[in-house]
Amino acid sequence: MSDNDALKSLLPPLAQARLQSLRLADGAATVILDASGFDGIERDRLEAAVKEALAAAPGVREVRVAMMADKPKRRIIAVGSGKGGVGKSTVSANLAVALARLGRKVGLVDADIYGPSQPRLLGTEGKRPDAREKQLIPVPTEFGIGVLSMGNLIEPGKAIAWRGPMAGNALGQLVDADWGAAEILVVDLPPGTGDVQLTMLQRHKPAGAVIVSTPQDLALIDATRAMQLFEVGQVPVIGLVENMAGYVCPHCGEVSDPFGRGGAEAEAARLGHAFLGRIPLDMAIRQASDAGVPPAAGEGPQAEAFLALARRVAT
């Protein structure tokens, strides 16, 4: 049995199955493994197991482990709005969770650099991401997705006063992080049509955009501007979501429409885009979101509204 065969026999079964090459020279054992589909934690565990298995082998003074992986074909879905306060971040978080519930491998980028909301919405406040080889590793959540947000990188409550290029660089670090096997990245963009949006379009080229608006005319005017930005950037608009659509009184059951009804659907039809559905103005959605538990992770009509949206986006 050769030295290499002897060393191979010492490797854990998973490492043997993933082994690309193994070489012993001058006391250094160099192991190259296929880490396709593994996230950062799984790669770290495998590397530690290999080093432990070979460290005491005769003639081995040093163990070097290199990981190779096929870069996954990742689909970026940008979630935008022309106006703040329309529930875009809530829709982004719940869309990501709903896609994960449908069996997709999903990551969520909080690209609202100046006003990050995802740590609160996903219950990750106070949790900082790790880093590996100058790449950030997403913060895991209880809901089957990883998330990266400036809210996890700065002190809570601290204001960020950066010019456009710095915000664009920050976006790049979030998008180009170690997303492991994620096949879909949902990107929660800031409101408006500024530097971060332009950087997203020019450097990262989303596969499509979901536009969030309330039914009222003022919000729809700005939502139309957001759609025009994506069209100019040659990013397909997947469709328009009408948020805060219809309020059911918890006492009498009467349905009212404080922001109007049907405006987003009519605007989508006018512009030739798909209408992706309505999300109700529901106290339960607000309460769950403030508590860091996305309604899409639960059951009932609130969850079903987001699951229906995810089914339309996933097709």
Region annotations inferred by a language model:
Residues 99-162, 168-170, 175:
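Phosphate-binding loop that captures ATP/GTP phosphates
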Residues 2-9, 16, 25, 35-40, ...:
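C-terminal lobe/tail of nucleotide-utilizing enzymes
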Residues 180-189, 194, 205-226:
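Conserved Switch II/interswitch segment of TRAFAC-class P-loop GTPases
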Residues 55, 100, 201:
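Gly/Ala-rich phosphate-binding loop of Rossmann-like dinucleotide-binding domains
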